């Protein structure tokens, strides 16, 4: 487990517990999404690189609050200020990831990524979604990605689990077994 994962955990839990208790999970999810977009901007990356290990994270907080503007409510701003005061703002992306996971668990939903070499038809998508719903006991959202390098088959990523049924992987295994 990385240091950022450990640092982010209590902040993600506090954010989730608060948002759940005041029934605004979707609002907080949206605000986390906005901050994530800000964090991924080149200007933000420059600010992140300039922060000292023991220095203030105020420049990063200012940038996030300015860019987030009216999209961030006062409670979320206060949450960010607490993270900054504790010099934990660098973990905000990981807090976002953990918050999203907690929200999905709470709502019994799961997003599953499906990589395919060619598009699946409606019936295949429905059968796959049904099988995953039965396996995980959650409402499933499928995100499909076309990846011609797979040659054929499918690679399914559900949480931390990867099911690789691609032709490419099977050919690689065969080559390994034949010592080619």
Swiss-Prot record:
* One term of GO molecular function: proton-transporting ATP synthase activity, rotational mechanism
Record bears the keyword Hydrolase: no
**Gene Ontology annotations for the cellular component aspect, listed alphabetically:** plasma membrane; proton-transporting ATP synthase complex
Ribonucleoprotein as a keyword? Answer: no
Tell me which InterPro entries the record gives. Answer: ATP_synth_OSCP/delta_N_sf, ATPase_OSCP/dsu
Q: Which NCBIfam families match?
A: ATP_synt_delta, PRK05758.2-2
Write the protein's name: ATP synthase subunit delta 2
Name the source organism. Vibrio campbellii (strain ATCC BAA-1116)
